[in-house]
Amino acid sequence: MPRTVIIDGDILVYKVSTGIVEEFEDEECIFQTVSWGNKEQAKQKVNDLIEKITKDTKSTDYIIALSDATNNFRKTINPNYKGNRKKIKPILWKFLREYLTTNHKTYEKPNLEADDVIGILATSEKIIKDDKVVWSMDKDFKTIPCKFRREFPNGTHESKIIYEDEADWWFMYQTLIGDRVDGYDGCKGIGDKTARKILGDVGEKSLKEMWIFLFLQMVMLFQSKQQKSV
């Protein structure tokens, strides 16, 4: 049966570009770290990794999801988004992105991250019509309904199916509590306990019902604050 593996291109590029770079520091002066990487080694390694991922996921084809390299709608809305990340990309980052887009099957959309693109590819019945599986090393894929294979740095992996009701619940949960690592604070005053109380158990409410319930909770909270201020 035909199967396409949707590869997290950001993770792919980062894994390869950081794995073969050498660094040198001159500590006798005001030092600057100098890095260099071998382009041929990088191409060979990324080709080998794509082949391995395709084989490991028992896929017959692959597509690589990439982030828009210049714009990100989240940073337009929230300038603090991922503000704690290093500003300088690994030295082979740009080269590998260009190599992938020129020599491999890639997919990207303006203003979107690879995660968003993966969500589109995994849930669309028109773009990829056959069986699909997502590959990444990122833990934050609970919000996408899909077959998912997560690789760990030590070489082990985890394979699971994320069902739609579970994905919807985690989407709402993360919307409420935020993600401090990425610089998104979520809804003020709502932590894990309150979020779980609002949402209930996985599958208890549909996505629409969770949105309505949340909206009503916010209205009640606003009215309560208004009454206290009178």
Sequence positions of predicted segments:
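Short acidic, glycine/serine/threonine-rich loops at helix termini
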Residues: 17-18, 75-79, 144-149
